[in-house]
Amino acid sequence: MELNTIQPADGAKHYKRRVGRGIGSGLGKTAGRGHKGQKSRSGGFHKVGFEGGQMPLQRRLPKRGFKSLATPYKAEVRLSDLEALPVTEIDILALKQAGVIGELARVVRVILSGELTKKVTLKGLIATKGAKAAIEAAGGSVA
């Protein structure tokens, strides 16, 4: 075996089928597009969501709700997330560094979900009644 004779194993490579290259290729003349019609033409295909002139579903259904611009600035943290953190004094910066909340978060709310067994001190965070009770029961505090 020499470097100039190396080639892939049989069946390892599938060559792209070239269409429109004569009768003998099996995909000449119409190139697998059939005869006439919009889909046989070059550039002949409809837009995504086009339903042949019928009013599209996206326009038939009413508009509903809105997307709050405040969403990226708010975040919720579970007690189980606090349990997993290596630090005991928890503020927004500690949560961002641990990747628990997004970089844009400004208002963080701790909710009662999961269990907390270690003593933690919250600074600058909002806690729900249940979460506050659970934190204090574990010997921690909410400042």
UniProtKB/Swiss-Prot annotation:
Gene Ontology CC terms: cytosolic large ribosomal subunit
Cell membrane found in the keyword field: no
Annotated segments matching region Disordered: 1-52
Disulfide partners: none
A biological-process GO annotation: translation
Pfam family, one: Ribosomal_L27A
SUPFAM superfamilies: Ribosomal proteins L15p and L18e (SSF52080)
GO molecular function: rRNA binding; structural constituent of ribosome
Record keywords: Ribonucleoprotein, Ribosomal protein, RNA-binding, rRNA-binding
Quaternary data: Part of the 50S ribosomal subunit.
PANTHER family: 50S RIBOSOMAL PROTEIN L15, LARGE RIBOSOMAL SUBUNIT PROTEIN UL15M
Physiological role: Binds to the 23S rRNA.
Protein name: Large ribosomal subunit protein uL15
Species this chain originates from: Herminiimonas arsenicoxydans
Taxonomic lineage from the root: Bacteria, Pseudomonadati, Pseudomonadota, Betaproteobacteria, Burkholderiales
